[in-house]
Amino acid sequence: MATKSNEENIAEFKGHNEIQIELMKEECIVVDNDDKPIRPGSKKETHLMVNINNGLLHRAFSIFLFNGEGKLLLQQRALEKITFPGYWTNTVCSHPLWIVGSELVEENAQGVKIAAKRKLNHELGVPLDQVNIDDFTFMTKIHYKSESKEDPQWGEHEIDHILIMQKDGITINAEPNEVMDYKYVSQEELDQLFKDEDEGKVKVTPWFRLIALNHLKPWWNNLNNLKPLVEPTNTIHRY
């Protein structure tokens, strides 16, 4: 017989993929409004709208990987994903974990960069030896909240650290439970993707759209000279 906690899990996860359910046990970093770590919180706890609507906030990161031609790598989230399944989004968007001395390290955004390398490998199969922590440039942070329309008991409420990397020779072997498709796009092709979304032809994650429409173009146009555009780590854009 299922315990009470198991019964609750069955109700919340009904119809969802077992691998994705298991990942909901990961310990994210619960933060305050200024992105200061408070405590660990499971991926499940931090993504339930009942908690989000009570103010629960966690740390995240978004990777924007460009190739040598200046094209941006996008992924389409697998249908197995619990939040925003089938949506197009930036290269990788995920969460650093509550790991002291590693993904919790604040200096130079070291912790989120360690997490970013881990998730490039997990989601897109990028070999660990093809990515160095120093390949990532931290740009800024955004604070946003969004409900997952497909299953509105789930959502996001994050302070999202934006990381940019430009590199050729990246091997991609996408994990099908995470990623159903991927492609490199030009600025014009990304503009078309948003037009297609407006016409109901595709779905795009809300955080990617926010970042792309409010911040991305100056970075994209200055990939060879990002340093002047890097913002202080205490800068948080609220949406």
UniProtKB/Swiss-Prot annotation:
GO BP: any one term: sterol biosynthetic process
Active site: C93, E158
Catalyses which reaction(s): isopentenyl diphosphate = dimethylallyl diphosphate
Keywords: Isomerase, Isoprene biosynthesis, Lipid biosynthesis, Lipid metabolism, Magnesium, Metal-binding, Steroid biosynthesis, Steroid metabolism, Sterol biosynthesis, Sterol metabolism
Pfam families: NUDIX
Enzyme Commission number(s) from the entry: 5.3.3.2
CDD domains reported in the protein's UniProt record: NUDIX_IPP_Isomerase
Cofactor stoichiometry and binding remark: Binds 1 Mg(2+) ion per subunit.
Single GO MF annotation: isopentenyl-diphosphate delta-isomerase activity
Pathways per UniProt: Isoprenoid biosynthesis; dimethylallyl diphosphate biosynthesis; dimethylallyl diphosphate from isopentenyl diphosphate: step 1/1
Cofactors demanded by this protein: Mg(2+)
Residues holding Mg(2+): H47, H58, E156, E158
One GO CC term on file: cytoplasm
Binding site for substrate: K43, R77, K81, S94
Domain Nudix hydrolase, residue spans: 56-210
Family: Belongs to the IPP isomerase type 1 family.
Role played: Catalyzes the 1,3-allylic rearrangement of the homoallylic substrate isopentenyl (IPP) to its highly electrophilic allylic isomer, dimethylallyl diphosphate (DMAPP).
Protein name: Isopentenyl-diphosphate Delta-isomerase
Source organism of the structure: Dictyostelium discoideum (Social amoeba)
Gene: ipi
